[in-house]
């Protein structure tokens, strides 16, 4: 390596000369931080300060003579994202212990201040020839991606001398470019760099995955030159996690029909349901006639998530010409029940030219709604009934029925929101449009006043949506009643409702001076539970579809692990439903209401560390923003790198991913045991 004088501005040019070898036994899934002794009272104090978000007191540990305490404190600031800690963290970039340096660099990136850019660049170990600082240098590159200027994106893309065996450095470079992309900072150069990573099989799979995820995530559209090249790569790609990202990328072609043959060919031979789902979503905006055979074929797929994805696309993008076919599918006994319910909604939406058939189906759906006792089946039917706007009175009644399950009330409100925001609103109601609009506005305010956490959240979000076209001036007189609702909410359990109503007040009043209250209610960390565990403690989740075994990541997220263990031992999770399933993304549970808007009377801190959601099976804490976590958690079904900076990872699936992939909305957590 050449010895070149260091310059901050030319940092990444100097980085061209960096070489580092990564041992082949490097384990990407293992967090390589200092081992933490949770019986240490000072360690406990740091986590207690994190839980209380006491940044000022926590900062004293950044100068502790104990490297473990410096490390734990620096990591904590990656969760707090406290700007005032920046200078103290900068000192740790020269710490004698590399783990402390890594934690400090990560935290500085999390803080996101542009002035950290030059500080981070100056700390890059440019003379590291044996890889001692490879992970540290990689962390710096990713951190710059979170806080750097656009000029540094060019420098980051220009690095070309890392060897294909320099796994950590290549990951850092790729993650840095990816983080820029999440900030909507991308260009031809960054696209070409990530495309280069993807197209060359010699690069580590982890780097190729980051590149493919980047291309699928940024908002760019791709010309024929890019999509033609990626099409051949996609067809031959053996890694399904890379393949599913490439499929999503192809769906962003400037000329969508040019890549349709590739996607159709891939769908026919594809065995991974996740890739099939991405193919269906990729063809979503193509002309209906070109994808109609594919969608009807997918309705009969053996995987329920593939079939239901196809049904959803018929709802969104169907045609009047095929409406009768949708109705026939809704009663086809060879289709799965949940698929048939979705096809009812598709038929109801598109049977515009067949009023008698539509009315008959509408009545049948209402009868089925009354007959079924399953609240999640009721919710699907209510959303389907929204496809005929004249059902609004029935939907209002269901949203306000206190005897209805929370998920039903929320779904009814979502259905009303769909009607009032529909681009077909005026076509549907014609001369009655303004009268119906006023009725819907009144219904939404009634729902907000009901105080139901889920329904009120949806209603408050809806009244200020531009597509709802509600006159803000005429709503100003209702601001006092919105304030009254805020006062009645139970905090922090109804935090999402508070946030939605607060935003509605700000929007309607046209004011930027209204202060928002903070409602974090930290709970004392159960150190007895944590110290009685080991780093190999597991959780066994028995569900209605089978068992899932988790490794609890105590070293990575002790607060979240202790919270999860205590809820499990108390029996809290027993009988809870998987209320949210987004195919090829996450399955989520732990909501006391069963609709995703429930919580308990406390919050816990986010624990954001350098771990990545870089494969399936990571278990994270759901939240309504940092430090609002409580009882809800999710399991990923595929790599979800965009979640890294904001969602705690506290466990990893060891066994039972096949069960995770089978879960549907309404499936049950029977019990959770800790081993």
Q: Predicted regions: what is each one?
A:
Residues 1-31:
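Bacterial Sec-dependent N-terminal signal peptides
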Residues 21, 360, 403-407, 414, ...:
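Cyclophilin-like peptidyl-prolyl cis-trans isomerases
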Residues 22-31, 49-63, 82-94, 113-127, ...:
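Amphipathic alpha-helical scaffolding segments comprising HEAT/armadillo-like alpha-solenoid repeats
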Residues 30-52, 68-82, 91, 101-114, ...:
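Structural detector for internal amphipathic alpha-helices that build alpha-solenoid repeat scaffolds
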